[in-house]
């Protein structure tokens, strides 16, 4: 083998190894974004149930019995810096085709999840108007019911996508570990606190 050919092979072998490590690290972080969203699913489901009770009480002319803020899911954006770098460079050309396809599918999924998490967050921002019920008018309640319907649809959609990514688009990686402090932060968010007053017996 000519020295120039040997040098080129060594160079690209090293470059691919470094790029692969960066991509795998980024994938692990992006998978943890999906895990983070699913950790909040019990809080989201409970809040949607509580909001339905609020709407039923309003329709019946009953006191709303609000005790807390509506809150919203915390959003972690998926990173794509390593993938963008690889896409605009030449290292991907030196990886096996199957690996390139697997990596591409994973990052497409992460980008879609990141976008849908942001859209879901906007819907919950709309629902946050319930934090000030005294200034709501009839038209506001109609808008809030529509926002509730959207939030329920987004919940189903985003939870499914997050679970799909964690089972089907891992590129052979596992999510970065979310420490106990992360779980504690979720528990302390308004979304995971009771919305309604506890009935006294």
Task: Give the positions of each predicted feature.
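Hydrophobic membrane-insertion alpha-helices, especially the h-region
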Residues: 1-5
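Long, hydrophobic alpha-helical segments that serve as membrane-spanning/inserting helices
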Residues: 6-201
């Amino acid at each position: 083998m000519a020295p120039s050919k040997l040098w080129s092979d060594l160079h690209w072998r090293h470059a691919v190894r470094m790029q692969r490590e960066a991509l795998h690290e980024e994938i692990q972080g992006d998978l943890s974004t999906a895990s983070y969203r699913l950790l909040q699913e019990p809080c989201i489901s409970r809040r949607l149930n509580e909001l339905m009770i609020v709407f039923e009480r309003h329709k019946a002319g009953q006191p709303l019995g609000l005790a807390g803020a509506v809150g919203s899911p915390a959003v972690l954006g998926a990173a794509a810096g390593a993938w963008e770098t690889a896409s605009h460079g030449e290292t991907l050309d030196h990886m096996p085709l199957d690996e390139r396809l697997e990596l591409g599918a994973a990052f497409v999924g992460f980008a879609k999840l990141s976008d849908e998490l942001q859209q879901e967050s906007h819907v919950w921002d709309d629902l946050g108007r319930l934090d000030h019920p005294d200034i709501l008018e009839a038209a506001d309640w109609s808008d809030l019911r529509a926002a509730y319907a959207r939030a329920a649809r987004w919940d189903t959609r985003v939870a499914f996508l997050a679970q799909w990514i964690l089972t089907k688009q891992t590129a052979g990686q596992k999510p970065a570990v979310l420490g106990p402090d992360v779980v504690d932060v979720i528990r302390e968010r308004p979304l995971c606190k009771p919305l309604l007053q506890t009935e006294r017996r």
